[in-house]
């Protein structure tokens, strides 16, 4: 948040549900969190109706802002910046099951889907950033490291291609998962503020 506050932005960094000091029993992988995010947006607007809001998230936070992008957002939301977001909950779990444990998506994910439906009350097949960005109207900046071994770079490419809104993309060479801002901080933040200056 420091780079944003230095540019004069007010910064809000909430814990996502069931993480840090936030309440909740189940991590929503972005799908449940997008509704929490909209509550934060509404709270900001209630305090200042003229607020211009930028949504910025990394990893699961990136999935959250992408999943929110396809919902009806207030006109105060001016841009979305996502760093290392995944296409869907199903896709990231399938990718990890294969990469980490050499397990097939079926029947592992199908069993997980039943548990998620029962316990957390959401369908992991429905929880798709890819489907949401197709409906997005707010400009989106997609950022990814080409050495990400958790969320593969191809997911960023698919998300970028699916988005019909104003968009841009930054791929940082040799950066792992959410490492882009540390690998090339000047490039990273210059791109963000250049992107934001174009949409004000």
Region spans (language model):
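Conserved alpha/beta-hydrolase
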Residues: 1-23
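Short alpha-helix in the alpha/beta-hydrolase fold that links the catalytic acid
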Residues: 129, 138, 152-161
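Catalytic active-site module of serine/aspartate enzymes centered on a nucleophile-bearing elbow/loop
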Residues: 183-200
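Alpha/beta-hydrolase active-site loop
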Residues: 27-48
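Alpha/beta-hydrolase fold nucleophile elbow
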Residues: 47-59
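Catalytic histidine neighborhood in serine/cysteine hydrolases
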Residues: 160-178, 185
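Short beta-strand/loop motif that positions the catalytic acidic residue
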Residues: 135-137, 142-144, 148
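Hydrolase active-site cap/lid region
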Residues: 67-123
């Amino acid at each position: 948040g420091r780079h944003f506050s230095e540019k004069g932005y007010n910064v809000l960094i909430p814990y996502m549900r069931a993480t840090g000091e936030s309440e909740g029993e189940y991590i929503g992988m972005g799908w449940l969190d997008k509704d929490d995010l909209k509550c934060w947006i509404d709270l900001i607007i209630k305090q200042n109706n003229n607020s211009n809001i930028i949504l910025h998230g990394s990893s699961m936070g990136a999935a959250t802002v992408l999943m929110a992008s396809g919902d009806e957002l207030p006109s105060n939301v001016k841009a979305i910046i996502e760093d290392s977001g995944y296409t869907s909950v199903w896709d990231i779990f399938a990718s990890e099951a294969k990469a980490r444990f050499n397990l097939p998506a079926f029947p592992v994910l199908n069993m997980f889907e039943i548990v998620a439906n029962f316990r957390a009350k959401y369908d992991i097949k429905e929880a798709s950033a890819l489907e949401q960005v197709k409906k997005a109207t707010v400009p989106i900046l997609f950022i990814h490291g080409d050495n990400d071994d958790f969320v593969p770079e191809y997911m960023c490419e698919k998300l970028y291609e699916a988005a019909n809104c104003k968009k841009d993309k930054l791929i940082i060479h040799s950066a792992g998962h959410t490492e882009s801002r540390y690998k090339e901080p000047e490039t990273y933040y210059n791109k963000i503020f250049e992107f934001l200056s174009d949409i004000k």
